[in-house]
Amino acid sequence: MTIERVQHSGAIVVSALVEWEGVKWLESATYYGYTIKAAKASFRDSCKRLNYTIERG
């Protein structure tokens, strides 16, 4: 999982390699007005709700 703060907007971009039913891809989400901790938790919750597995590595 990669977490970046965008300088000009203050947004937080969370990206991770995810897997669903044998297919893997890079999933990214942009969070405005979130703390890094809250953005990371929201990303994890979204992946869990969609039954995506976040790949470790």
What spans do the regions from the language model cover?
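Short, mixed-charge low-complexity intrinsically disordered segments
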Residues: M1-T2, R44, K48-G57
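Intrinsically disordered, low-complexity serine/threonine-rich segments
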Residues: I12, V18, Y31, D45-R49
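Short N-terminal "domain-start" leader segments
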Residues: M1-E19
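Stable alpha-helical structural segments in soluble proteins, enriched in small hydrophobic residues
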Residues: A39-F43
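A short, exposed loop/beta-hairpin motif centered on an aromatic-Gly-Thr core
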Residues: V23-A38
